[in-house]
């Protein structure tokens, strides 16, 4: 199958599975989305959604977050990984929003990525989901799917993002980002995945990437002493020698 045909078929399947894919992080506006995405680093969206109601009840604006002591922010997000660092970043980025952007989340990659704790992926999510700007956020999960389906041979998320942007139309990037997140969780997980029943891997994943079993370099060669069905004589020989040695020792 030509790659263009594969891309079109994948897009059709994702549209059928998730015609209205929702942002998995609970938020109300660009600022709360930015906060939620910062908190999601090395953490599941489910856990983030468990702590943000309490945090946002106390600070849902840059002004309120900047006033809240770092220790209080950390207490609200204590169950998340990297909580001390994330708390400091939330306080610092809120202060920068007030000082440099009039208390508003900026609508540019350069300004977003200059904020504490905000990398390219976080900025991409905010740009496309909060402002509708062209962006294709790629995390390790989307990177895995792209490799599994033979859409990218990128060595990292940046290279995979580049490849996916070339394959899919710009107008679909934001939708595809969400569809891929949901599809990976529900149909194409990293572990315990059966490619035979996956709506995409079942036909679109190269055998070496689908997780299907296949021959390996460790397979025995025909005629070798380790061929299937032929037991290695070494363990039996060692056992016999040990038995003879014990017999001689008892006879002494």
State the predicted function of each range.
Residues 1, 205-252:
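Polybasic, lysine-enriched low-complexity intrinsically disordered terminal tails
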